[in-house]
Amino acid sequence: MKLIKIFAALCAAVVLLVGCGSQPTTTDPSAGSSGDLLDRHGLTGMSAEQVIDQLDRSTQSRPTQLGGSVRPDQLLLTDGSQEAILPLPDDKFYLAIAPFLDRSHECHFHSLGTCQGELVGEAVHVTITTVGGEALVDEEAVTWTNGFVGYWVPKGSAGTITVDQGGKQGSVSFTTGEQDATCVTTLQLV
């Protein structure tokens, strides 16, 4: 019986020591491994908006070493060994749009390192209009290496995205609530 008590005490001591030696988990991008991740990829000091804009416009072929998932309220970054979470502005919502002719992919939260649209380097005209008729975007653009174009629009808005390209056009509706899609891959040009 005494041997069992000694064994139990030793096990408890090991658990206590292991717990004391572990590093705390953090989502603060300036602390620990999160800061290291940002530093290693040249993103230190950038806002989440700046990181998204830089990674989405990257000319690297997909998939990239650094991945990012754009959520309505945060950006989740990972390189396979470390992670960082950056908060997004409370009043803005990122819409990544991949117009297509023949093929697309299912996507809800835009993946900065793996999403690949069909139309790369193509001139398009993008219009984003609210249900009230306000034009949020009305411009010529060129799709990036990943086949997307991206826009920051007001959070809580809803409306229609229209893309024109080479005499073809497509439209889809959008909403920018807490669980809405940041990745628009259903806009087929016909």
Model region roles, listed by residue range:
Residues G21-P24:
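Bacterial signal peptide processing site
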Residues A84-L88, F93-P99, E178-V190:
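Extracellular beta-sheet/turn segments enriched in Thr/Pro/Gly and aliphatic residues
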Residues S157-Q165:
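A short, solvent-exposed beta-strand micro-motif common in secreted/extracellular proteins
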